[in-house]
From Swiss-Prot:
Miscellaneous field: The mature peptide does not contain cysteine residue.
Annotated protein name in UniProt: Conorfamide-Tx2
Naturally occurring in which organism (per UniProt): Conus textile
Role of this protein: This peptide activates human sensory neuron-specific G-protein coupled receptors MRGPRX1, but not mouse receptors (EC(50)=0.54 uM). Compared with the agonist chloroquine (anti-malaria drug), it is 600-fold more potent. In vivo, induces itch sensation, since intradermal cheek injection into humanized transgenic mouse (mouse MRGPRX1 replaced by human MRGPRX1) induces scratching.
Propeptide: 20-25, 44-72
Residue span of region Positively charged region crucial for activity against MRGPRX1 receptors: 32-39
Gene Ontology annotations for the cellular component aspect, listed alphabetically: extracellular region
């Protein structure tokens, strides 16, 4: 694995661990950043369908249509 790939993997792991920690305290956080595509992503939202509520992370880009059973 190249150095860049290793750093990317380490960063992804760190973000996942931190989001899991935050998820146990809060229902979720909203992140936004600007770039070629302005994106808003909710991280750490609990998946109520999952038996592993505090362990599973849902990454959902806002603006995509949600299934009717998962609307807030």
């Amino acid at each position: 694995m190249s150095g860049r790939g290793f750093l990317l993997l380490a960063l992804l792991l760190l973000v996942t661990v931190e989001a899991t920690r935050v998820e146990k305290k809060h229902s979720g956080i909203l992140l936004a950043w600007s770039g070629p595509r302005n994106r808003f992503v909710r991280i750490g939202r609990r998946d109520m369908q999952s038996p592993l509520l505090s362990e599973r992370l849902r990454f959902r880009a806002l603006g995509f249509r949600q299934p009717s059973s998962q609307k807030q």
